[in-house]
């Protein structure tokens, strides 16, 4: 995907046209992410006094900005004003979390109507008529809505919003720079907010008035303009950490001075009443009490979004350390926010072998450290959520989430103690157990109809998997010589695996599967692929006489290459069947893996009654590869999207297992018959 066009012609990643940027605010020196984004954008942070050709950088209208303005004026240096982008992080900057993008403005600052700005220039003069750009804008707007993403994201969509039908009045931080810029008269800001509240009541007789307090006011960091004195029978202060998207959905009207929530209200379909002069006022999408002069153009929501979110910001990809388009920032933020929402209460974990604990701590313990305990009472009383390794769960673990490896796991085997890139956490059951409904079952049902954006995303992901032969373990191997004819691939499995115990029928061993295939396809070329754990001598399932039933035993073979070389696949419950479906190879299931029973496979067993919809292969893939698993990038040490995980698997630039894990793995080969000790 190409990077979004920038309004700054000298902003480059390569640094071919660079500029010295003199700063007089310590934050430019201490905030590594800010420095890095500016560096990638072509700016060398410098100290001292500027010379000809140099520029001066200031942080918006911060308390230290006057220093830079004075130096710039004295030395005739251009000012570059820098701010956080409109999609920033989970927490505000005061928590130390780095931004995912910056607004680098060489003209003014977006919230000050007394100055021009690069954003206002875009809104005034850019054609904003490119069909591809508008399509990107609409897709990104939908993604932000679906994922409940905002500038700051320390809220949970499960927090219930108020009863709908209210008029939303947005409070802001007292003396906020955007308020000062919109109301430049000293002392007039409080009166403006009072006026806004009065208008909201007068223009909506009988309606409930909901004052949304600013998160930093709710947390006691900074005062707002409204407090308990403004509440009455009709007016309520609301400070619950609810999704802004849900809050706007229930509103019948929105009133704000200059809050970003006003911008989000426009994107949600509102025409908010504006009592300041923010960048989004004056373009025909708002009702302006004080219309900004010179804004005569009429824009659509998609045009405004394209300018403010795609063209104006400088976005950063923390996984690849590069500038990037908005879409990749949404990918990254969505993964980080999902981790915060699921992990913020902390986790107690049971039945986790020692070697798994460090990777799990990195995966799930970034917001609150995990605790590991085999005492169920301790786990229940911990005040944390509870997880158990799925195959080890018993009735004593009722109520715990079930944990398992995801479907794009690693370069190397789990049995060789290679840490996973992907894990699934299921509240109901687990994907390989067809005896009870799982979260994956629900997700597949929800994804029967994909939006065009979702379909494009998953199709692109699947095409990359196919092109680069990405599978669960990504083991290298050669393709053996295969006889001509109708080829049937039979993947072997670990015979004591939970998926066999729970998901197989009468055909529940590799030998029985081979015999069934030979009986059904007597003239076919039958290719048997042993499971890599079995090949490594780490798990049960070896067939001594496989050649009696198979024409080829493809040991150490590349599974993706095998799939591409056959006409069909027969399996009990192997994930290789799912990988074959992605490659449009027909699959016969004699068991009930998660992908059976939806009309995509030829099934020998009756499917569970809840598998009663007919998704397409892309719907199945979206649920299984995007919605269900979580991914973790060991290079950036951050939650990540499936696309980043695939990047890592393709490049192979993954940390190798530590020496202790390698030693344990070798020991396991000697103790394979005692696998319960280490699995």
Spans of features found by a protein language model:
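Catalytic donor nucleotide-activated moiety binding site of glycosyltransferases and closely related
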Residues: 197-240, 514-556
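Histidine-anchored nucleotide/phosphate-binding helix
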Residues: 35-38, 169, 182-203, 361, ...
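A donor-sugar binding/catalytic signature common to diverse glycosyltransferases
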Residues: 62-68, 241-286, 387-400, 404, ...
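Segments forming glycine/polar-rich beta-alpha architectures that bind adenosine-containing cofactors
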Residues: 47-53, 57-70, 74-90, 147, ...
